[in-house]
Amino acid sequence: AFSNAELAREIYLRQNFGIANAEEILLPGTNAKMNEFQALMGLLNLKYVEQEINNRKKKVELYRHYLSKIPGIKLLPNSEKIKQNYAYFPIVVTEEYGMTRDELAVKLQKHNIFPRKYFYPLITDFTCYRGRYRGDTPNARYIADRVLCLPIWGGIENIDIELICEILELKV
C-alpha cells in the first residue's frame, strides 16, 4: 500500500510500540493494531473476563505451589490490597538459581515453552532514548536482567504448568 518502504516501516513500527524485535525498540510508538472487527470481538467477550481471571488465579496458585520450593526463583509477594488480573506470571531469576534468566529462557524454548523477558531492555537502553538519560537505575537494571514471565492463560493445562516447573527444578 506504500510506495515508500522506509515510510511503511516507520508507520508499522509506530503502531506497534516502536518494537523492531524482541529486544529492540527503535522509536516511540503506540498500540494501534486493532481494527473495528477486533474491537467488536473484544466487546462481545467482556462477559467472560471474570471467569478468565478466576481461571488464571488458579493457574497462578499452582505455579506458586511448585516454584516456591526452588532456590533462586523469587515470586512476587501476594497482597490482599491489590486485585490482580493475572495477565502475567513474572518470576525473578537470582544468582542462587545457578543460571541466568537468559539461559533459563533458552532452556525453556528448547522444550517449546516460550517465556517473555519483561522490563527488558530498559527504556533508557532503547535505541531511540539511548544517551538521553544520564542517571543510574540499579533497581530497574536488576529487574530488567532477571525477570521472566512464564506462560499463563486460563486454559493452560495443569500438566503443562507442572512440566514447566519440573524443567525449572531440574535445571537441565
Whereabouts are the PLM-identified features?
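PLP-dependent aminotransferase class I/II
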Residues: 3-172
